[in-house]
Amino acid sequence: MIDDDGYRPNVGIVICNRQGQVMWARRFGQHSWQFPQGGINPGESAEQAMYRELFEEVGLSRKDVRILASTRNWLRYKLPKRLVRWDTKPVCIGQKQKWFLLQLVSGDAEIHMPTSSTPEFDGWRWVSYWYPVRQVVSFKRDVYRRVMKEFASVVMSLQENTPKPQNTSAYRRKRG
């Protein structure tokens, strides 16, 4: 489903842990990394598409995450000309995306790259919050910067409310 301007409706997903790190996924068989994302099917809401893509791409279900925020507006990026499929009609020149910020509430063990015939990702890792903005492919960089800027205060408040681990190796005075 391509809109009149040539953009495909899509959802993007930022998954964070309690430490404020974000899940960074490696595209199958490539050296490029990105956040999970995928198209919105006809008749599907952005939230429904997000949960479907979440399960299809990283094996997480609704019970594994909590929605913390979503972008106020649709964000767009254009594909480089070399990636546009000119032989398809209508021609898709880019993506318009609604982004969701999710907190992982289950454990890391629940994350698994599905073994379908066409998996999207073949690996993942936790990275610092701003790392993806510098590392994503250049044509997505502006959207990533805007998404991370919009979600930053939510993630930072999450970190502030997370209890810090006790320093169990602290020096103790002997009473004598």
Swiss-Prot record:
Q: Name one GO cellular component term.
A: cytoplasm
Taxonomy, superkingdom: Bacteria
SUPFAM superfamilies assigned to the protein according to its UniProt record, in alphabetical order = Nudix (SSF55811)
Show the Pfam families listed in the entry: NUDIX (PF00293)
InterPro entries the UniProt entry points to: Nudix_hydrolase, NUDIX_hydrolase-like_dom_sf, NUDIX_hydrolase_CS, NUDIX_hydrolase_dom, RppH
Q: Name one GO molecular function term.
A: mRNA 5'-diphosphatase activity
Q: Where is this motif: Nudix box?
A: 38-59
Q: Which GO terms describe its biological process?
A: mRNA catabolic process
> Which controlled-vocabulary keywords does the entry list?
Hydrolase
Q: Where is the Nudix hydrolase domain?
A: 6-149
Q: Which cofactor does it need?
A: a divalent metal cation
Q: Recorded E.C. number(s)?
A: 3.6.1.-
Q: What does this protein do?
A: Accelerates the degradation of transcripts by removing pyrophosphate from the 5'-end of triphosphorylated RNA, leading to a more labile monophosphorylated state that can stimulate subsequent ribonuclease cleavage.
- Family per record: Belongs to the Nudix hydrolase family. RppH subfamily.
Which protein is depicted? RNA pyrophosphohydrolase
